[in-house]
């Protein structure tokens, strides 16, 4: 079974945090490949601030072209919109039946995961790797054990979950695409 990580996002724009995390994930987990899934739109974000999808796709390809095991995917571009993660994962399973998919998301997203469409389906059927999105997690970088602990949100306490793993040691990057766009407009 081929283990593929799905690291989805608008990548609007792609930045060193995305690239650094992708490199760390492929080097420090059991994934065979990490696919950066460029989303044509995010149902939880405003679409009017997005750069054209082909521009974002090209920028992500350029940013990770030299990282072995990291690929860029436009798979969601051919799916009905808006692009919901559950639909994407369902379609990936259909097209790649011999692959196992793991969702790679930020700690900020797992906190609101119960707002995602069909989040129960995702939790029950796919592994989820959670990377740090705040400074406290930076204390873990490079350590074999870590005091920064991650606990599943309260809404997940009584749910059937395939695997929910916090990526201890993953680097924290104090940057976001939202912050970059805000700086560019001022």
Where are these regions (language model features)?
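Nucleotidyltransferase catalytic core that binds NTPs
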Residues: 1-186
């Amino acid at each position: 079974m081929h283990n593929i990580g799905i690291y989805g996002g608008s990548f609007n724009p792609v930045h060193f945090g995305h690239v650094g995390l992708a490199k760390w994930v492929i080097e420090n987990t059991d994934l065979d490949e990490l696919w950066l899934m460029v989303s044509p739109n995010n149902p939880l974000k405003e679409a009017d601030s997005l750069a054209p999808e082909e521009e974002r796709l090209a920028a992500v390809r350029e940013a990770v072209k030299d990282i072995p095991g990291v690929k860029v995917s436009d798979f969601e571009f051919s799916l009905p919109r808006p692009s919901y993660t559950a639909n994407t994962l369902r379609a990936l399973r259909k097209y790649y039946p011999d692959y196992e998919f793991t969702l790679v998301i930020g700690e900020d997203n797992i906190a609101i995961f119960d707002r995602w469409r069909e989040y129960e389906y995702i939790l029950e059927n796919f592994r989820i790797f959670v990377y740090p999105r705040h400074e406290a997690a930076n204390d873990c970088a490079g350590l074999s054990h870590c005091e920064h602990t991650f606990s599943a949100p309260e809404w997940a306490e009584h749910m059937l979950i395939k695997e929910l793993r916090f990526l201890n040691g993953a680097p924290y990057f104090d940057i976001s695409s939202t912050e970059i766009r805000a700086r560019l407009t001022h």
